[in-house]
C-alpha cells in the first residue's frame, strides 16, 4: 500500500511532463545539468500558473544525483509530486460510467500484482486500448511508484484508477460487491474447466464489464474466480497455457474494449 498522504517520484522528462499535464502538483525537481534546457519550456509554463507558488529546481551532476538518490538516474530528471486524494470506489465507478456515455464500459481489476514493471505495462496497454479505468486490490503495488510510472510512459497519470477493497482479509468479497452495486459483470481471466474463450461474442454484449487480472505466477485467487460471474481464457497454441500478466492484459483489452480510431496524433512535448 502507498501512503495516503505524501509524495511520489516521477522519473524522466516525458513522465514528468505527463504528470504536470494531468494536473498533478509538483513539489520540486532534481535534474542532471544537460537536461535543464530540455525542461525549461515546462518550467516556464509552471511559472505562469495562476495561484501557484514557486517550485524549486535543483541541478546537479549525474554523479551527485546518484549519490543523493542511491540509484543510477539514467533518464536525468526526477520530480516530487503531491499524491492526490484516493477516490472512493463508488464515486470512481460512477465517474467512469458517466464519462463513457452510451458506449460499453470496461474496467480492469488488478489483484495482488507486486511487480512494478507489470503494473506500468498494464497501464500503458490500458491507455492505448481504451480501458475506462483500473482498480487495484489491497495487496497490489503502487501504480505511482517511480518504476511503474516510468514503464507506463506516464500513462498512470492518464488512465483513471483507484484502490478497491478495504483490506486484504476481506478481499475479494467487498470488491466484488462494490462492482456489482455499480452494475458491473465480473470476468476472471483464468484457466478453469468452465472458462469461456476470450473471443466469445457474448462478452462483447456486456454493457459494464470488470476484467480481473491476477498476480504473477499464481494468478487469481480461488475465491476471486469463484466470486466472478465467469472465467475467461485466452485461446493459445503449442500447448502454452498462460502469458505474462502484462501481455495477457493487452490481449484481453484489445478483444474486449471498444476500438478507437487508428489515426496517430502527434502531441508536441509528449513524444521525443
Predicted regions and their residues:
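N-terminal positively charged helical leader segments and presequences
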Residues: 1-72, 268-272
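Active-site/ligand-binding-proximal alpha/beta "capping" segment
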Residues: 187-240
Amino acid at each position: 500500500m502507498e501512503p495516503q498522504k505524501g509524495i511520489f517520484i516521477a522519473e524522466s522528462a516525458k513522465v514528468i511532463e505527463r504528470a504536470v499535464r494531468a494536473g498533478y502538483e509538483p513539489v520540486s525537481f532534481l535534474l542532471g545539468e544537460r537536461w535543464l534546457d530540455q525542461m525549461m519550456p515546462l518550467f516556464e509554463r509552471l511559472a505562469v500558473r495562476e495561484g501557484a507558488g514557486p517550485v524549486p529546481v535543483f541541478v546537479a551532476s549525474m554523479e551527485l544525483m546518484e549519490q543523493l538518490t542511491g540509484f543510477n538516474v539514467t533518464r536525468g530528471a526526477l520530480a516530487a509530486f503531491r499524491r492526490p486524494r484516493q477516490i472512493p470506489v463508488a464515486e470512481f465507478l460512477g465517474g467512469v460510467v458517466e464519462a463513457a456515455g452510451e458506449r460499453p464500459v470496461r474496467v480492469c481489476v488488478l489483484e495482488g500484482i507486486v511487480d512494478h514493471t507489470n503494473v506500468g505495462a498494464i497501464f500503458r496497454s490500458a491507455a492505448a486500448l481504451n480501458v475506462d479505468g483500473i482498480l487495484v486490490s489491497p495487496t497490489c503495488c503502487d501504480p505511482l511508484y517511480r518504476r511503474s510510472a516510468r514503464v507506463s510512459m506516464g500513462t498512470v497519470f492518464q488512465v483513471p484508477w483507484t484502490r478497491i477493497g478495504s483490506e486484504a482479509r476481506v478481499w475479494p468479497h467487498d470488491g466484488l460487491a462494490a462492482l456489482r452495486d455499480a452494475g458491473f459483470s465480473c470476468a476472471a481471466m483464468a484457466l478453469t474447466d468452465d472458462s469461456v474463450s476470450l473471443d466469445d461474442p457474448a462478452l462483447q454484449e456486456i454493457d459494464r464489464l470488470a476484467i480481473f487480472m491476477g498476480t504473477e505466477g499464481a494468478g487469481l485467487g480461488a475465491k476471486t474466480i469463484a466470486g466472478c460471474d465467469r472465467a475467461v481464457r485466452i485461446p493459445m497454441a503449442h500447448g502454452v497455457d498462460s502469458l505474462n500478466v502484462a501481455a495477457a492484459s493487452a490481449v484481453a483489452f484489445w478483444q474486449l474494449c471498444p476500438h478507437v480510431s487508428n489515426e496517430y496524433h502527434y502531441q508536441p512535448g509528449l513524444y521525443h
